[in-house]
Amino acid sequence: MPLTLSFLPSFERSLKNLDTEQKEIIRILLKALTAYYDSHSNLHEAQKNAPGFFYKQLRKPFYEAGVERKLRLVIRREGETCAAMMAGNHDQVRRFLANQ
């Protein structure tokens, strides 16, 4: 069964701090992430939508996804349920995780 993605209020709040270009990058990232989850975590399928797509575990239960190194998406993964928690740059992600 493929993983499912939901969005937490903290993710919606983090989008308000992004400019139009960054929001477009997040849109591309979410499309690639959806392809990754729908293909049972096949990285090649996700990279068809976004060649620079990456997905890695930070520490349980937190994962990070991105299509470029500047913007990342923090995901909390529990079983087959994944929740997008926030979008931001490296420093914003570190600060966010320090408070979790």
Predicted feature descriptions by range:
Residues 1-71, 77-82, 87-100:
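Basic, Lys/Arg-enriched alpha-helical interface segments
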